[in-house]
A protein has these predicted regions:
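Soluble, non-transmembrane alpha-helical interaction regions
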Residues: 47-49, 60
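A short, glycine/Asx- and small/polar-enriched loop/turn
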Residues: 49-55
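Negatively charged, low-complexity tracts enriched in Asp/Glu with abundant Ser/Thr
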Residues: 2-46, 80-91
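Long beta-sheet-rich domains in secretory-pathway and surface-associated proteins
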Residues: 23-24, 69-71, 108-109
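Intrinsically disordered, low-complexity regulatory segments enriched in Ser/Thr/Pro
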Residues: 60-91
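Signal for well-folded cores of large energy- and translation-related assemblies
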Residues: 30-33, 60, 101-105
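C-terminal low-complexity, charged extensions that often adopt amphipathic alpha-helices
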Residues: 2-7, 88-110
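Ser/Thr- (and often Asn-) enriched beta-sheet segments in non-cytosolic proteins
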Residues: 39-43, 58, 70
Length: 110
């Protein structure tokens, strides 16, 4: 019974339109990046070539940005309800945020 409830819960968050998933991804990235520093913002790039297929995101702290992170729409839409996938993505985002902070600290030390 519990497994069935968990699967139903996961399906509730899976899928969605490109824009719905984009909104979820932006909120997820911001939520985890801001755990490292509330000044960090997640920015999703608008690119017609990626529209409907991919998302491109960076973390920004002032004038500094993280390397580009790309996400396939289908993967995010299907897996955003999976705890293990979300945990791995959160770890990746927080690591990018820490690297961005380390670069910011080094730049201010100069």
């Amino acid at each position: 019974m519990l497994c069935r409830a968990l699967l139903q819960f996961a399906r509730m968050f899976s899928s969605g339109s490109y824009d719905d998933v984009k909104r979820w991804l932006r909120m997820f990235l911001n939520s985890h990046a801001k755990r490292e520093d509330p000044r960090i913002e997640a920015v999703l790039e608008d690119d017609e070539a990626r529209e409907g297929r991919f998302y491109a995101a960076r973390l920004r702290l002032g004038s500094q940005t993280s390397p580009l992170m790309e996400f396939e729409y289908d993967v995010v839409a299907q897996r955003r309800g999976e705890l293990a996938w979300c945990a791995a993505l959160a770890q990746r985002v927080r690591e990018q945020a820490r690297q961005l902070l380390a670069g910011s600290t080094a730049a201010h030390a100069r």
